[in-house]
Amino acid sequence: AGTADCFWKYCV
């Protein structure tokens, strides 16, 4: 959803 929603290889 934004740049702060990046987890491992998944940026949503």
Swiss-Prot record:
Locations listed in the record: Secreted
Domain of life: Eukaryota
BP terms from Gene Ontology: blood vessel diameter maintenance; regulation of blood pressure
Entry's Gene Ontology molecular function annotations: hormone activity
Keywords: Disulfide bond, Hormone, Secreted
GO cellular component: extracellular region
Pfam families (alphabetical): Urotensin_II
Disulfide cross-links: C6-C11
Family indicated by similarity: Belongs to the urotensin-2 family.
Chain's role: Urotensin is found in the teleost caudal neurosecretory system. It has a suggested role in osmoregulation and as a corticotropin-releasing factor.
Protein name: Urotensin-2
Provenance organism: Gillichthys mirabilis (Long-jawed mudsucker)
